[in-house]
Every structure is written in structure tokens, then in C-alpha cells.
Amino acid sequence: MAEMKKTIDNKPAPKGEKKANRRGAARLAAVQALYQMDVGGAGLNDIFAEFESHWLGNEVEGDQYLPAEQAFFQDVVSGVVRDQAKLDPLIDVALAKGWPLARIDAILRAVMRAGAYELEHRKDVPARVVVSEYVDVANAFVEGEETGMVNAVLDQIARQFRADEFSRG
């Protein structure tokens, strides 16, 4: 019997629910966690405990949160925290001139940091999928030009880290 991936809610995936849905939920949760750490100053252990026990897979203020792949969520959040000093300059270079990362809204910083981390470290996920997923996450919070900016920044970073994927077509 195949081993099931653990999720933040520790429940097996319902029949027909795709791993991608749990990864998408993990990405959204990771961005929310990174945002909360950025603006609220919460620590990594506190964030993990809060999200794993109170948010994911539960109903909060009338919204049902999807279960998320725990290992993926933790990898993205802890990886961004660990590598932020390396990720931020990459994002700064990819941003339009005159728009330093510090000037970008905190939620978009979280989206771009998570996407940049995944592009550099999660080679198991195709670059185009990573970019598309984080544009979708950005769409959950903002509209219009800002999602285009996320797409442009992550596309540039993807081409830097995964040029071979783009040369194949």
C-alpha cells in the first residue's frame, strides 16, 4: 500500500482530491504565515503551531480552510526565513527600477519570497507551475497590475534558476 502524505490536518486526502490541491493550499498558507511573520513579528515555531492547529482544514470566521501538505508548507516557510537575505536581492533585481522590495506591499513580498524560494529549491515542481501557482495566490489578495508584477518577477527568477526548462520550450 502506498504511503500517504501527511497534511497539516493529519487527515488522508479525500478520494479524488489531488496532491496539487494540497500543495496549492500549502502555498497559500505559507504566504499568509510569511505575511504574519513580516507584519506581526511572530516566530517560526509560533507560526507553525498556530497554522497547524487553528487554520488549515478548519473553519475560521465562516471560511473553510483546505487541508495542506504539511511538509511542503513547513519547507517553504522555513526556507524563506532561512534564505531571506539571499532571496530579497534576487527579487530586488527583478523588480522594475525605482521599486525596491521594501516599497512593495507586505503580502506581495511574501508571495514573491515564497515563489523565489520554491524556484530555487523545489526542483520537483516545474518552474512554470511555480510561477502560475504564486500568481494565483497573489490573485487571492490583489488584482490587476500587481499580479502582473508577481508574474514578471517570478518569471525572471525562474529563467535565472531554471534556464534549462525554458530552453526546452
From Swiss-Prot:
Annotated GO biological process: DNA-templated transcription termination; transcription antitermination
Highest taxon, organism lineage: Bacteria
PANTHER family named in the record: ANTITERMINATION NUSB DOMAIN-CONTAINING PROTEIN, N UTILIZATION SUBSTANCE PROTEIN B-RELATED
Gene Ontology MF, one: RNA binding
GO annotations of cellular component type: cytosol
Stored SUPFAM superfamilies: NusB-like
Pfam families to which the protein is assigned, alphabetical: NusB (PF01029)
Keywords of this entry: RNA-binding, Transcription, Transcription antitermination, Transcription regulation
UniProt cross-references to NCBIfam families, sorted A to Z: nusB
Biased composition (Basic and acidic residues): 1-19
Protein family: Belongs to the NusB family.
Coiled-coil ranges per UniProt: none
Region feature Disordered, mapped onto this chain: 1-22
InterPro entries hit by this protein: NusB-like_sf (IPR035926), NusB_fam (IPR011605), NusB_RsmB_TIM44 (IPR006027)
Known function: Involved in transcription antitermination. Required for transcription of ribosomal RNA (rRNA) genes. Binds specifically to the boxA antiterminator sequence of the ribosomal RNA (rrn) operons.
Name of the molecule in the record: Transcription antitermination protein NusB
